[in-house]
Regions:
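Conserved protein kinase catalytic core
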Residues: 11, 68-69, 156, 175-177
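Short conserved micro-motifs at the rims of enzyme active sites and ligand-binding pockets
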Residues: 15, 158, 179
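Active-site activation/catalytic loop segments of kinase-like enzymes and analogous catalytic loops
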Residues: 28, 175, 179-193
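Short hydrophobic-acidic sequence motifs that mark active-site Asp/Glu residues
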Residues: 3, 60, 146, 167, ...
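Conserved ATP-binding subdomain of kinase catalytic cores across diverse folds
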Residues: 2-109
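Activation of the activation-loop gatekeeper triad in protein kinase-fold domains
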Residues: 169-173
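Secondary-structure capping and boundary motifs in well-ordered enzyme cores
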Residues: 53, 80, 143, 148-150, ...
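ATP-dependent phospho-/nucleotidyl transfer catalytic cores
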Residues: 67-149, 153, 157-161, 166
Length: 193
């Protein structure tokens, strides 16, 4: 089995430029990995086909369910959290000081430049007052790498016995501090309790 991602640009309304660009970024990411052997230190789907046509793009990927990663989690154990953190550490180490060519300059879906409406809506607080400073520190990190950019729990696929993990959804991959992925992942594992 294979997994087909097909995006038809005509279906997007005006004002969705960032969303369209995110799919182009993902296509660029998979172009870097087209027909490469499977990376054993961190698992992503193999890309078999990556084409752009006039009004659509098509990416043909390995089906991770058939590759031994059929499980998706909504609740996660400490061991599974550690497994994902090890994945992210290997991912970030592999791409340390990598150029962002064709990817987001500032990776991640959530960064201050893209979340101004949410920032304005926040109640006055120390976090709101220091948001620009925190964002600047993260963006000027000495140890830049490529970040997954949307490292939430839903974007990780687990083996049946939960001793291996793979990542999907690379629409917001780009440059940054690896802690952005770590913080977003850990936050996605929390619930109201």
């Amino acid at each position: 089995n294979l997994f087909l991602k097909r995006l038809q640009f005509l279906k997007f309304k005006l004002g969705h430029e960032r969303k369209i660009k995110s799919y182009q970024i993902e296509q660029n990411w998979y172009q870097r990995h087209l027909n490469l052997p499977v990376n054993k230190s961190f698992r992503i789907p193999r890309c078999y086909l990556n084409i752009s046509l006039k009004e659509e793009q098509i990416i043909l990927l390995e089906d991770l369910d058939n590759a031994g990663f059929p499980s998706r989690k909504t609740n996660i154990s400490i061991d599974e959290i550690n497994l994902v953190l090890k994945f992210l550490a290997k991912f970030h180490a592999n791409y340390l000081n990598e150029k962002t060519n064709g990817l987001w300059e500032i990776g991640t879906y959530w960064h201050l430049d893209t979340r101004q409406e949410e920032w304005v809506a926040m109640e006055d607080s120390p976090l709101k007052k220091r948001a620009a400073e925190i964002d600047k520190i993260l963006n000027q990190s000495q140890f830049k790498t490529l970040v997954h950019g949307d490292a939430k729990l839903a974007n990780f696929c687990f083996s049946k016995d939960a001793d291996k993990v793979a990542a999907v959804d690379f629409q917001y991959v780009g440059g940054g501090c690896g802690m952005k992925d770590v913080a977003y992942f850990l936050g996605s594992c929390l619930n109201a309790n």
